[in-house]
Amino acid sequence: MNEEIIELSQKVGGLLSEKGNTVGIAESSTGGLVSAHMLAIPGASAYFLGGSVIYTRFAGRGFLGVTDKDMEGMRAATESYASLNAGKVKDVLGSTWGVAETGATGPTGNRYGDAAGHSCIAVSGPGSRSTT
């Protein structure tokens, strides 16, 4: 595991615990690594409600309840898709915060033409705004 990410996960986990908040995570190109780092922190069960790798539309439907209507005019690896998934994972798990990641890892990028390393991250919180 990456020590820098572990340190960041400890800080995030500490803030969540301190405020009595919870988080749910929907990942795509990171393949569960964000969740793994969050869960590597002792006491993560106090704030981590769950995570899922949403690598296909089928997974989005099954785990998050993403509908064809939700996806109209949208594709994966975009800010709007990350925002949708952040809101969905928050709603499905009933967490205070929803975090979603989508992108293209590599070495060649994705089928949409996004270069390797392209990433969109969104956070959905207690308010009505999602930020990417």
Regions found by a protein language model. Give the residues of each.
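Short alpha-helical segments enriched in small residues
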Residues: M1-T132
